[in-house]
């Protein structure tokens, strides 16, 4: 809507290639003409897309945490009454404690939702022991972070590995890697599942199917 399909396609390809230097250069060039005007149009488009997503989910109870490109401010300003922002929170579901720690793994892109490993570690510490840990990005396991389309390793949380091995939650749920080499892995005694709804097969995870 703002930059056109050709420019966006180039950005996507550079991201797939992990060519962060050229991607950053291209991104900067897109704001040269009138930075303030372009930024305003971009923000309007971002708000509109959040609103469209929340409108589509209006009949469901939604728990949300930020990902690598998400803004807490925009989420909270656009989310509907059925949405609960649960980052850094623990909720009780039936007999289980479910913890949520959002944010994206830091990259050279420096997207608005990325946080430092130190900040992410503090989120995990705040949660303590839970039965299910929910994050945006996966633990740092090669098979879980490798994208089979680009044949490149994406991002994973090393502090999440430590948390899983120390606290031993029953499940680790995450997304972020869109075409993972493995969508399931066992780390210690914890079952790690990529639950992203992206595989073009209309499948999604029903929590009740795992816990009865």
What are these regions (language model features)?
Residues 74-82, 150-161, 185-199:
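Short, electropositive alpha-helical surface patch
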Residues 94-132, 150-161:
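Binuclear metal-dependent hydrolase catalytic cores centered on His/Asp/Glu-rich metal-binding motifs
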């Amino acid at each position: 809507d703002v930059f056109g399909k050709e420019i966006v396609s180039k950005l996507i390809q550079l991201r797939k290639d992990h060519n962060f230097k050229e991607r950053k250069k291209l991104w900067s060039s897109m704001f040269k003409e009138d930075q303030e005007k372009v930024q305003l149009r971009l923000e309007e488009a971002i708000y509109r897309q959040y609103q469209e997503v929340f409108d589509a989910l209006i009949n469901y109870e939604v728990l949300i945490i930020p990902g690598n490109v998400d803004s807490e401010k925009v989420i909270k300003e656009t989310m509907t009454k059925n949405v609960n922002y649960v980052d850094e929170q623990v909720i009780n579901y039936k007999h289980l404690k479910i913890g949520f720690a959002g944010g994206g793994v830091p990259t050279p892109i420096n997207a608005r939702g990325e946080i430092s490993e130190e900040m992410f570690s503090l989120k995990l510490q705040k949660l303590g022991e839970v039965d299910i840990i929910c994050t945006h990005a996966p633990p740092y396991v090669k098979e879980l972070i490798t994208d089979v389309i680009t044949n490149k390793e994406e991002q994973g949380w090393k502090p999440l590995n430590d948390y899983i091995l120390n606290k031993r939650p029953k499940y680790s749920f995450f997304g972020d890697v869109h075409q993972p080499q493995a969508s399931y892995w066992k780390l210690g005694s914890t079952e790690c599942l990529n639950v992203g709804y992206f595989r073009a097969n209309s499948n999604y995870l029903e929590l009740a199917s795992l816990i009865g």
